[in-house]
Amino acid sequence: MSRGAILFAFNNPKYDYYAMAEYTAKRINHFLDLPVTLVTDESSLPLKTRYKFDKIVKVEPDTKNKRDGVAWINKGRYQAYDLSPYDETLLLDADYMVNSDKVLKTFDITEDFCCHDTTHFLMHPDASQEFLSTYSYNTLWATVVAFRKTKRAKQIFDCLKMVQNNYNYYGDLHNFIGGVYRNDYALTLALRIVNGHTLLPGDIIPWNLIHVGKNTQVYANTKKPFNTEYTVMFDHWNRGKIRKEYITIKDCDFHVMNKDIFVELING
């Protein structure tokens, strides 16, 4: 039975997502010992690169999604089921920092499909969990997904496509802001629709998704190519003054929400 990872990466005028995906793929190879397939478009591919993905799948991106005034090409994640060449697949965001082999445990959790339903923000331990809206579901996260090529997993990805195609309708129904498409919101709805508007224990990764959020900086503690130790710094405002707070983390996977920070980590 084959096992691998799949990443989606489409460049826009602000960020080189291909470079992010290449960096993440190298860490997947190193820490997880898995091959990596990249889904991208022709214009995102560099003219020269020394890294070789297991497979590159070129698709036509949907560029209608806009964020911060530029195209945010994050639609089409539902294609992961059909485009993955593996029997068991890890679907990761290109800005997910792999620092251990912990994510491999997701394949022991479920027979079909699993994702995170809770988060922890570094330096923000009291941050509340996210909901679609005040009276709707708690958000599921598409940052880390594990799935197998099963009938039920296929149904989930087919439903994800349906939600994407009717995103504004579901925004009105669940009272969240439509327009800017979010994979997290689409997954939140698709998985519950397939399950009869509930969640199954095997669908949930039983540890928090670690986020690096706003007003937080991350610095690699060494120049090693596969460094796993970082200093996390937070500017804490107290009575009109800034107090810098620090922690050190090691061998901890985390998702970098601020792409500028991820680029800085790539560039050393």
Where are these regions (language model features)?
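Class I SAM-dependent methyltransferase SAM-binding "motif I" and its flanking Rossmann-like core
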Residues: 115-127, 131, 136-139
